[in-house]
Amino acid sequence: MSSSNVEVFIPMSQENTNGFPTTTSNDRKAFTEGAVLSFHNICYRVKVKSGFLPGRKPVEKEILSNINGIMKPGLNAILGPTGGGKSSLLDVLAARKDPSGLSGDVLINGALRPTNFKCNSGYVVQDDVVMGTLTVRENLQFSAALRLPTTMTNHEKNERINRVIQELGLDKVADSKVGTQFIRGVSGGERKRTSIGMELITDPSILFLDEPTTGLDSSTANAVLLLLKRMSKQGRTIIFSIHQPRYSIFKLFDSLTLLASGRLMFHGPAQEALGYFESAGYHCEAYNNPADFFLDIINGDSTAVALNREEDFKATEIIEPSKRDKPLVEKLAEIYVDSSFYKETKAELHQLSGGEKKKITVFKEISYTTSFCHQLRWVSKRSFKNLLGNPQASIAQIIVTVILGLVIGAIYFGLNNDSTGIQNRAGVLFFLTTNQCFSSVSAVELFVVEKKLFIHEYISGYYRVSSYFFGKLLSDLLPMRMLPSIIFTCIVYFMLGLKPTADAFFIMMFTLMMVAYSASSMALAIAAGQSVVSVATLLMTICFVFMMIFSGLLVNLTTIASWLSWLQYFSIPRYGFTALQHNEFLGQNFCPGLNATVNNTCNYATCTGEEYLAKQGIDLSPWGLWKNHVALACMIVIFLTIAYLKLLFLKKYS
């Protein structure tokens, strides 16, 4: 194979079936309508850290280099080895890549993409991000409610949903749950079609898919591509990345783009790719899968490729493939640049752009078709359905709360009004406070588990960050922290025989709720934006352990050195424990058999609740009680603000 710059001319009408039967259907139908997406001189560079040592400057890495091409209505496949840049190119075309380090133009029918392109086009991610606790129809209803304009009636939206269900062949499973790790649901192919249906609700003219066959068996993968082929015949421009498709899938492609190391190896009609590489010096054995053959060429796998051995193909290139890979990719890229395919593509690109330099648009704006309140209602509705549809966690939490309440009630049953009563009251109130904190650690999952779902739906214009944030709080966080506090108070309060007044009972319940909400808010502030639950859980546990030390039971806060005492003001258990002590001890008498004279002489004995509170440094006034709730409320606001800002500024583009 020569590296000279001699033009490799391959007639555009040439077709090579490689021994396979030709298709008689009009798979290569020319579309007169539909969107034509063209990309001009796309370059993408990222800065990566060169090491863990501080002070090292990041190194710039080229991901895509001068990529040009045209995607017309039909099936447009982007093929390449792992790390070749196919997913990066797909994200660039779909306006879902971080614009920093990106240059070049992407045009739709010769014009710049609209600012709401991400919302008008469809994008199916590699990992299916659908709510598994909902049915197929309910998932599509959620997409329709938030992505279709409010001017459409519910009847029109339902007609659109039914049409999508029928088009995707989901009629039999429309009312079946998609499925989770705990709930058996639809098959993998039906789940993938549901993900596609979520995007088809808006009837996009361009549909992007990131490796739609990943995780599917060969038969299911073939069925998914046949579905996409039928959709492309309706005039849709379908662009997708794929890795090693079998021949029955490959023959469905209308256009093929081959990438390696961010360079363009081939771009043109898929059925003419074999003839192109054969004229370039590569021959595919009969009945070999063309897609595998192309990857073998790019990877330099000479054991599977029959090469025209020229004088410059030396034995060292076979022995040391790592030294040969980069030059081989460069040679293939140069051969393509010298081919007639590249020349005709450039001429068509020039015609589409009108020869004018377009202004690059940064696509970070997201438009919404619905109001904040409408989005809030639907996010809350879906979250509540998800809670009811996956009752294992919620029911388990309630059962554990009931059992733990009964155990604590049995241990501290019938508190006495003596010196032991003081110790036992302080102990059980401390336990109630710390238990509320540690049971709130589960709140870290609220945003971590749905991170991919949130990012995809936010970029696609389903809802605002604020709608999602408050919707999750109202439907998930509030009820799941309120109910255990109510149950715990009702069980424990009367079994322990605490102060028998209604106001004391409800103050205790309110205090436990505030502790649970503040601890959960702290969990959200730590976990928001995280990808791993275990990391957030570990950080939460460490924080609560330090907070316990400054809660007021393990050490008397009045005895702590001044240079450390300020840490008590950051302790959630301290505020809860102080409020519970103020509520329970105020007005109590623990020495009913002693008169005032004896009580005055026995300064070492604590006979009243006021004395105990004074020794703990607790203010006896009503403000001494309510200031703890004010502090907890302030912490809730601060932590929720941090969580919201972390979601708002979360890196949503790859």
Swiss-Prot record:
It is found in: Cell membrane; Apical cell membrane; Mitochondrion membrane. SMART domains: AAA. Residues 416-427, 498-505, 556-629 are extracellular. Glycans are attached at N417, N556, N595, N599. GO terms for molecular function: ABC-type xenobiotic transporter activity; ATP binding; ATP hydrolysis activity; ATPase-coupled transmembrane transporter activity; biotin transmembrane transporter activity; efflux transmembrane transporter activity; protein dimerization activity; riboflavin transmembrane transporter activity. GO terms for biological process: biotin transport; lipid transport; renal urate salt excretion; riboflavin transport; transmembrane transport. Residues 1-394, 449-476, 527-534, 651-654 are cytoplasmic. Residues 37-286 form the ABC transporter domain. This is Broad substrate specificity ATP-binding cassette transporter ABCG2. It comes from Macaca mulatta (Rhesus macaque). The gene is ABCG2.
